[in-house]
Structures are given as structure tokens and as C-alpha cells.
Amino acid sequence: MAKLTKKQKDALSKFDVNNSYSLSDASALIKEITYTKFDASVDIDVRLGVDPKKADQMVRGIVTLPHGTGKDVRVLVLCTPDKAQDAKDAGADHVGLDDYIQKIEGGWLDIDVIITMPTVMAKVGKLGKILGPRNLMPNPKAGTVTLDVAKAVKDVKAGKIDFKVDKFGIVHTSVGKVSFSPEMILENANEVLQVLAKLKPASAKGTYVRSITLSSTMSPGITIDKSSVAGL
């Protein structure tokens, strides 16, 4: 077992890893146990009682965080020329089509989200092997394949994120930064949980939300008391 650093020991001394905490308390505690020199991300991990191998139990959704992610999301819009100016005006970082497809094929991936249009998906679809494994492939369910690219850009910049359960039945997503106030972290995390609660598959049996953990980059995970979250 790796030896704990002084900072890790300090963090662990501030809470009991065997206890569960209310979401409100955890949102404040996460700021106290994070010692990174940079503004670390705050993440939530929710273990669900679903079988992702079954198509009718694949949990996927979209949530707009009330206070955003705290991250400057880099957006590429792949669109026809008539929509290019709208995308730029909405705040897209990169706008184009064939030129950016070639850049991506050449290894360029300096982006966080790609938004495109149904009419050009035939071209974008050829990038599936590159974008798919990196979770960058545009998807209609995520709102990133749309005719209204300007609205999609604004939504993403405002804190709209999409998530899906992984093969282990866990949903992992960011709910802000350590620099956020406890109230901002709480409200963002609660929004994710409320959206997840509404997405319970009809075919899922037993306990739906099995565990919730709040953590930051490099920090220990704080177990959340599910009873502290209304609607679960």
C-alpha cells in the first residue's frame, strides 16, 4: 500500500471515511479536504442499480447546472457556411466543416464539445472511431446534433452537460470547482441527482440509486447519505 502524504493525512483527519454525510455538509467539507494548488474539479459519482448491457436500462441524460461547471468549455461547431456566423456569434471557439474534419483526422482534438447539424452528419460520422472513444461524438439525444447550432452553443457554454452510465453502472460527472461556494456545489449536485431520479428505467429492479460519492481532484471521496437528498 502506498504511503500517505502529509496532505492526504490532513484531509483524512477532517472526516470519517466510514461515515456518510448530508449533501449539504459534504459540499462544504469537500473544500476543506482539497489541497491542490490549482482550482480542482468537484465530481459526483452515482452508482445505479441498472444493467447497462440491457438497452432499456441505459441511463443517459442532459442537465443544465445552475452555476455551470466552472470550466471554460471549448466548443467546435461543424456546420454549413450559412450557419457559421450564428455559431460564432453564440460563442463557439471553432467553426468550420471540411477543414476541421481534416484537422481531427490529423490528430487535433483541442476541444471539449462538438456540435453539428443533421445535414452534415454523414461527413461527421466518418470520425466515429476517433471521437467515439473520447466521448466527443455529437448525439441528437445530447442536443449536439441540431439545426439550431447557436442555441446549442449557448446552452453548453451556460453549463449544459450530458452524462451516461458506464459499463459498471456508474454515472460520473463534474458539478463545479473547489472555488465554488458550498451552496453552489450543493445546488449543482442536487440538480444532477434530481435529473437522474427522473430517468429511472421502468425495467430496473431493486434499489435504483445505490450510492453517491462526492470528491475533488486528488481528494478522498465523501459518501453521501441518500436520505439527505429529496426525491431519491
From Swiss-Prot:
GO terms for molecular function: rRNA binding; structural constituent of ribosome; tRNA binding. GO terms for cellular component: large ribosomal subunit. GO terms for biological process: regulation of translation; translation. The keyword Nucleotide-binding does not apply. PROSITE patterns: RIBOSOMAL_L1. It holds the Pfam family Ribosomal_L1. Keywords: Repressor, Ribonucleoprotein, Ribosomal protein, RNA-binding, rRNA-binding, Translation regulation, tRNA-binding. HAMAP family: Ribosomal_uL1_B. Binds directly to 23S rRNA. The L1 stalk is quite mobile in the ribosome, and is involved in E site tRNA release. Protein L1 is also a translational repressor protein, it controls the translation of the L11 operon by binding to its mRNA. NCBIfam families: rplA_bact. Belongs to the universal ribosomal protein uL1 family. Part of the 50S ribosomal subunit. This is Large ribosomal subunit protein uL1.
